[in-house]
Amino acid sequence: MPSADQILFVNVTTTVAAAALTAAAAVSTTKSGSGNAARGYTDSDDDAGMGTEAVANISGSLVEGLTTVTAALSTAQADKDSAGECEGAVEELHASILGLQLAVPEWEALLTALVLSVIIVLTIIGNILVILSVFTYKPLRIVQNFFIVSLAVADLTVALLVLPFNVAYSILGRWEFGIHLCKLWLTCDVLCCTSSILNLCAIALDRYWAITDPINYAQKRTVGRVLLLISGVWLLSLLISSPPLIGWNDWPDEFTSATPCELTSQRGYVIYSSLGSFFIPLAIMTIVYIEIFVATRRRLRERARANKLNTIALKSTELEPMANSSPVAASNSGSKSRLLASWLCCGRDRAQFATPMIQNDQESISSETHQPQDSSKAGPHGNSDPQQQHVVVLVKKSRRAKTKDSIKHGKTRGGRKSQSSSTCEPHGEQQLLPAGGDGGSCQPGGGHSGGGKSDAEISTESGSDPKGCIQVCVTQADEQTSLKLTPPQSSTGVAAVSVTPLQKKTSGVNQFIEEKQKISLSKERRAARTLGIIMGVFVICWLPFFLMYVILPFCQTCCPTNKFKNFITWLGYINSGLNPVIYTIFNLDYRRAFKRLLGLN
C-alpha cells in the first residue's frame, strides 16, 4: 500500500504531466500551422484544429487516468489509516441499574464519578476562595495578585466548563451532546488549559522582573500594565484554541454518538498548539525560575554575610602593627584606663575593612557598652589591665556628603561625663596610621572608667572619594567590648589590635535588625522551595499529556487504551486544582484570608 509520500509524488507527477501535454499541444498547433502555410494548403486551419483536438483528447485521457489512479491511491491510504486507527474506541458496554449503557462496569463508573467529582468540587472551592481572598482581604489587594486571580479564573472555568463533560464522556464511552457542543467543548478545553499555563508563565515573569530589577519594575507594575499583560495572556490563548473552529481540523463531517469527540489530530495544528500551549511556556518558566533561584540564593548569602558582619562578630581578624602608636593612660581610683588612637584607612577597596553597611558613603554607627561582672583578666604578656568586650550596633543614617569622621565617647558615673572627638582625612593606602600622624588626632578627654554604663557614638561621613578612613579609639577599661587591645610586643612601643568574637550583647535596635533579617531570609527560603514545587508539579501534571498529544498523530501504530488516555488527561486537569494550593498555602496572608472566609478564626 503506498505511503503518503508516494501519493504526494503521484499528485506532483500528474500535475507535471498535464502541463507537459498542454505545452505539447500548443507546440503541435504552431508547427501544423507553419507546415501547412509552407505547402500552400488552403484548409490549413481545419487540419491544425483537428491535430490540436487529437492532442487535447490524448492529454485529457492521460490526465483523467492519472487522476483516477491518484484518487484510488488516496482512498486506499485513507482506508488503511482508518483500519490502522486504534480499534475498540467504544469497548464492550455494561448495563447499569439506571438503564444506561456504560463503557466500564457499574462499580467502576461509580468510583470514577465519585473521585472525579471530588476533584471538581475541590478545584471550584479552592479557586473561588483565592478570588474572594484577593478582593475581600486588604493585605492581598495588591497589583501582583491580579495574576493569581487570572490564574484562578482560568482554573475555575476548567472545573466548570470542561471537567463535567469529561466525566460523562469517560463513563459513557461516547458523546451524546451533538457535534456543535463537541466542538465548543474541545475549544473551551484548549482555551482554558492554555490560559492556565500561560498565566503560570506570566506569574514567573512577574517574579523574575521583580527580583532582577526591583526599583524600575515597581514603578512599571501598575494596574494598567498588569491588566494589559493578563489580557494578552487570554488573547494568545484564544489564538491558539480557535483555529480548529475555522477549518484547521480533521473532524468528520458526519457525527454520530459513536463518533469520538476528540481533539483534532491534524499534524500542523498539533505542533502549533503544543508549542504555544506548553513547550514554549515550559522553556520560559524553566529559564526564569533558574534565574530566580540563583538570584535568591545569592541574596541569601549576601544577607547572611551582612548580618554576621554588622554585629561585629569577626573571627580573629588581627590588624597589622602600627608604627608610632602609643597608649594613653588615665587614672580612676587607682585603676588604669588605656586608650589607643589610630586611623583605619580602607584605600581602594573599602570592603576589605568595612562591613556592607559601612560601604555606603553616608552612615552612622551607634553602640552601647555595659560593665561585665568579671573583667579582671590578665593580658597575654602579663599585663593585669582588664580587657573589654563591646558590641557595636550599626544604624544607617543619612549624612552630609563631605569627608569628615568623628568619634564621640561619653561615660557617665555619678553625674560626671567625659567626651573625646577627632577628625580624619582620607589616606590612599590600606594600613593603620598613628594617632598623631597626618590627618588628625584622637585626644582623650579624661575618660574615667567605673562601674556605670557607658554610651558611645561613632559617626562616619565620607564624600564621593572612595578612599575613606575611619579613626578608631580603643579603650581598655571595665566595660565589655568586642575589640581587644594587645599590649606592645617589643620595646619600640608597637601595638596590635585584634578583633575577637566574644560574648555578644545586642541592644534593642540590634535585636530589631536581626529579627527583620531573619524574617526576610525565611521568606526567601520559602520562596525558593516554592519555586521547586511549582515547576515539579507543573511538569508532572502536563508533560505526559502533551507528549501523548504530539506523538499519537505521528504514530499510526500507537494505540493507548481509553483508560490510559483518560488518566493522562486528568493528570493535566488536576493541575488546575493544585494551583490554588501551591500559590497560597505558603503565603500567610492567604491562609488568614481562607480562615476568615471559612469562619475558622
From Swiss-Prot:
Repeat listed as a keyword: no
Stretches with biased composition (Gly residues): 436-453
GO function terms (MF aspect): G protein-coupled amine receptor activity; octopamine receptor activity
Cytoplasmic side: 136-145, 206-225, 296-530, 589-601
Transmembrane segments annotated in the record for this chain: 113-135, 146-167, 185-205, 226-248, 274-295, 531-552, 567-588
Residue ranges, Extracellular side: 27-112, 168-184, 249-273, 553-566
Domain of life: Eukaryota
Region (Disordered): 361-465
Glycan-bearing residues: 11, 57
Gene Ontology CC: plasma membrane
Pfam families the UniProt entry points to: 7tm_1 (PF00001)
Family annotation (InterPro entries): GPCR_Rhodpsn, GPCR_Rhodpsn_7TM, Octopmn_rcpt
Cysteine-cysteine disulfides: 182-261
Subcellular localization, as worded in the UniProt entry: Cell membrane
Keywords recorded for this protein, A-Z: Cell membrane, Disulfide bond, G-protein coupled receptor, Glycoprotein, Membrane, Receptor, Signal, Transducer, Transmembrane, Transmembrane helix
Database matches in PANTHER family: ADRENERGIC RECEPTOR-RELATED G-PROTEIN COUPLED RECEPTOR, TYRAMINE_OCTOPAMINE RECEPTOR
Role played: Receptor for both octopamine and tyramine, invertebrate neurotransmitters, and neuromodulators. The activity of this receptor is mediated by G proteins which activate adenylyl cyclase. The rank order of potency for agonists is tyramine > octopamine > dopamine > epinephrine > norepinephrine > serotonin > histamine. For antagonists, the rank order is yohimbine > chlorpromazine > phentolamine > mianserine > cyproheptadine > dihydroergotamine > clonidine > synephrine. Tyramine has a functional role in the olfactory system as a neurotransmitter or a neuromodulator.
Family recorded in the similarity comment: Belongs to the G-protein coupled receptor 1 family.
Name of the protein in its database record: Tyramine/octopamine receptor
Organism of origin: Drosophila melanogaster
Lineage: Eukaryota, Metazoa, Ecdysozoa, Arthropoda, Hexapoda
